[in-house]
Structure formats: structure tokens, C-alpha cells
């Protein structure tokens, strides 16, 4: 599936005759995993596509691509695995408002 239509696996969109979005709803399966189904998939299909731009109070920008996020997501997953956290375990994360945690 190509990038322009991949998101349709997870959303319903309805547009009017002028191309203006009229309705939008989210759909996802019970086994939906944002890191795998979105970040890793986009990281695989278009690794250089911009996913996130962080701007600090001084106006400095930090850009992250889907490829960057996929690598960071895998690092986090491996860290959790190393701590003995398994699929299905419940965890709570308290994160600062910083791009490294988004």
C-alpha cells in the first residue's frame, strides 16, 4: 500500500464537492500498535519523510523523520525488553514536554 492511502486503514474521511473535509473518524483494530502500525510502517515506506518538528523558545528547530522515530521506538522497545517488560504488561510513563519523549 502506498503512503497517500495507507492512513485509510485507520481513519474514515468524507469530503464535500469542493474537497473540504466534512467528516472524520478514527478506526483501528483491537491489536493496533501505534509504534508498529504507523511509525515503523511509515519509517519503512518513506524513512526521510518529516514526522515531527520541535521548536524551542529561542526558535531553534529540531526535525525528526519517520525513520528517526522508528529507530528511537525500537531502541525504547529493546530497553523495555531488557528490563523484563513483556507484551501485555501494563506500564506508566511520566514524561516531560520535550521532543525526545514524543
Identify the residue ranges that each predicted region occupies.
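Short, contiguous pre-domain boundary segments
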Residues: 15-25
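Acyl-group handling in specialized metabolite and lipid biosynthesis
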Residues: 23-30, 59-64
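Conserved AMP-binding/adenylate-forming core of the ANL superfamily
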Residues: 48, 52-102
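A short N-terminal helical cap/helix-turn-helix that marks the beginning
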Residues: 2-10, 30-52, 75
